[in-house]
Amino acid sequence: MKIFKFGGASVKDAEGVKNVLHVLNTVGHEDVLLVISAMGKTTNALEVVIKNYFDKSKELHASLQEVRKYHNQILLDLFEDEDHDVFFDVNAHFDDLEYFI
């Protein structure tokens, strides 16, 4: 088994995500375990969202929109067709989170 860990800085943008694919294409897809951290500073950004939630801050929705915008930009850089299912899937998670908060 091959295990690969990609930290947040290594998947902070579309080029980093493409590099993960390159590694998989190089070593193969069988008997591989990937551990991938949150992209870029997403963990920090989500901590801000959570803090805003508990503080009942007026910045709550704006802070969540920043995280959504960041992920959507990466998707736009990776996929030419904005009708690709991945846009729906990722944004559905953000919609669920938005509804929750």
Name what the model sees in each region:
Residues M1-I101:
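Nucleotide/pyrophosphate-binding catalytic subdomain
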